[in-house]
Design a protein with these regions (language model features):
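Long, well-ordered, tryptophan-enriched scaffold segments
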Residues: 1-66
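Extended redox/cofactor-interaction regions of prokaryotic respiratory oxidoreductases
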Residues: 2, 47, 92-212, 220-230, ...
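Structural signal for hydrophobic packing residues in well-ordered secondary-structure cores
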Residues: 5-12, 37, 53, 60-67, ...
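Acidic/polar loop patches that form or flank catalytic/metal-binding clefts of enzymes
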Residues: 15-17, 56, 70-71, 99-109, ...
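Hydrophobic alpha-helical scaffolding
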Residues: 19, 31, 35, 46-49, ...
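Short acidic (Asp/Glu) and glycine-rich catalytic loops that position anionic groups and cofactors
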Residues: 35-41, 65-73, 166-170, 234-244
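Short beta-alpha connecting loops at secondary-structure transitions
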Residues: 218-224, 237-248
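Long, contiguous, secondary-structure-rich segments that constitute the structural scaffold
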Residues: 245, 249, 253-299, 386-399, ...
């Protein structure tokens, strides 16, 4: 992304009017991306990425000269220690080409939408205790912007009891030991050792729930509950209301009902404005603009989409013209990053373990490991117990290039061991040219609901857990990021066969009417 900016600004392809009127720090950005040491030329980017300098130039020109144009990015941007700077560069690309909040460009959220759910109850419920949030003193940007304790430092607190012991836990639709945590066995051991009580609200009993929860509250599935959903995180927002369509099983409740019941029990005085869950939903999710029961009748409601909101005061809470930043402009030179102790301009930081940064490891671990691309059948660790989905992807897959397979004697469909200095797991090889010959791509979030769920097996989640190879405590200066996409590893064939018995999956999870 820095190299794309380099091409655009050196060739004068930026939207000069938008840059002059609505951005802050363009000259500083130009100086940074063209700097011989801190900048990023297409040739330098080619050495890092393997993408040719000519192709980088072609892509930059194509984007800059397409009016309008939009950029979409996904989770992978966050999954490295340099992720905040990658995001900064992508936003800079949108800004310098004038593709922000214009028809066909990248649309910003409307401040007048008024969603109440972010931070609901934080001031009343947490108050001065917020100053004791784990990690706040070291990473205030992380803790203040996403309003929770720093994840890696929470692991440290669980293990050491410092700055204070962690004794209570709650999961809500979270399967951290199978899906989201680096070094998951380390998290398992810390949680089991430290927590005196833990409960979860979930539709299924996961390895995380089995290992650490004293109480499991059944969560109503989508068809068993009322609810609302939004698109685009509030930008160009559409609202969908849905009403319960199926009879509930047992004592299942929705998340809203559970929060409402627990909240009223703990502090009834905070809930006096809400006579029932519908009123709570109307305020929290619909900002009192719509009544929930009216929304539930509709298939979809599209809010008015207003462009050029920076020109009419719809991006800022104070109603002033401009963008929601200290300068009122899109900050190419970020005063907010500067406030939190980071460089206000984008920079490239090589991953901690890479061919360039740790060449001494290449003899033992010659392949770049990337993880977590989403298969069609699953969303993270969900749907492993749905036989129709599991048929599409019955086993954990690692994709390797044909040249690598030939060199290592790996056959298509053979089980392999993947390992590095942090841990190991086993997955099933898929030979494909979709991955580079220096790269290994492994699926994540695997567990096997058809297996024994008791300790120590826990549905086999640690056996094919690629996060075993991912370390904690590798994040950026402001505390964000993790190295899920950029590590080193070795891979070798094994004689064992761990193929899923699909007949067992069907028998255990077939529909009641089958």
């Amino acid at each position: 992304a820095m190299a794309l900016i380099n091409v655009i600004v050196t060739e004068g392809l930026e939207d000069k009017q938008f840059v002059e009127c609505w951005t802050y720090g363009f000259d500083a950005l130009k100086a940074r991306v063209t700097d011989s040491e801190l900048g990023m030329s297409p040739e330098k980017a080619e050495k890092i990425t393997g993408i040719s300098a000519d192709l980088i130039r072609k892509a930059a020109r194509m984007y800059a000269m397409a009016k309008p144009a939009a950029i979409s990015w996904g989770l992978a941007i966050d999954q490295n220690a340099n992720g905040m700077q990658v995001g900064q560069c992508i936003l800079d690309l949108m800004a310098i080409t004038g593709n922000v909040d214009v028809p066909g460009g990248n649309i910003l959220g409307d401040a007048t939408t008024g969603l109440n759910e972010v931070g609901f109850g934080f001031e009343k419920g947490v108050g001065s205790l917020a100053t004791k949030m784990v990690g706040l003193d070291q990473y205030p940007a992380y803790c203040n912007l996403i309003m929770n304790a720093h994840a890696d430092l929470m692991l440290q607190a669980l293990e050491t009891g410092k700055p204070y012991p962690i004794k209570f836990g709650m999961y809500a639709g979270n399967n951290l030991m199978s899906c989201t945590s680096a070094e998951p066995k380390r998290w398992h051991d810390a949680i089991v050792k430290s927590l005196e009580f833990c409960f979860t609200v979930d539709t299924f009993i996961t390895p995380s729930a089995e290992a650490s929860c004293d109480l499991i509250l059944p969560l109503a599935a989508s068809a068993e509950r009322d609810g609302t959903t939004f698109t685009h995180y509030g930008a160009s927002m559409g609202i969908k209301g849905f009403a319960q369509a199926a009879t509930r099983t047992g004592e299942a409740r929705s998340n809203a009902e559970t929060c409402f019941a627990i909240g009223k029990k703990l502090h009834p005085e905070w809930w006096e404005d809400y006579k029932d869950v519908d009123a709570f939903t109307t305020h929290l999710r619909l900002s009192n603009k719509y009544e929930f029961r009216e929304i539930a009748k509709e298939v979809y409601i599209q809010d008015e989409c207003v462009y050029y909101k920076n020109e009419c005061g719809r991006l800022r809470g104070d109603g002033k013209v401009g963008f929601n930043t200290p300068t009122g402009r899109i900050e190419l030179y970020s005063t907010i990053f500067q406030q939190f102790g980071d460089d206000p301009l984008p920079y490239y930081r090589e991953p901690a373990y890479s061919p360039q940064n740790t060449p001494e490891l290449l003899e033992q671990f010659p392949y770049v490991l990337t993880t977590g691309a989403r298969p069609y059948a699953f969303f993270h660790s969900e749907n492993r117990q749905v036989p129709f989905c599991r048929e599409l992807n019955p086993n954990p897959i690692v994709e390797i290039n044909p040249k690598v397979a030939q060199n290592l004697g790996i056959a298509d469909g053979q089980w392999v061991r993947i390992w590095n200095q942090f841990g190991e797991c086993v997955e099933k090889a898929k030979i494909t040219e979709i991955v580079d010959e220096n790269t290994i791509h492994a699926q994540h979030a695997w567990w096997f609901p058809e297996e024994d769920g008791n300790e120590p097996n826990l549905y086999g989640t640690f056996r094919s857990q690629i996060n075993n190879l991912v370390p904690n405590f590798h994040f950026g200066r402001m505390g964000f990021g993790a190295p899920f996409k950029n590590l080193l590893c070795y891979i070798e064939p094994i004689s064992e066969n761990y193929d899923t018995n699909m007949q067992l999956v069907w028998e255990k999870f077939k529909r009641e009417d089958q």
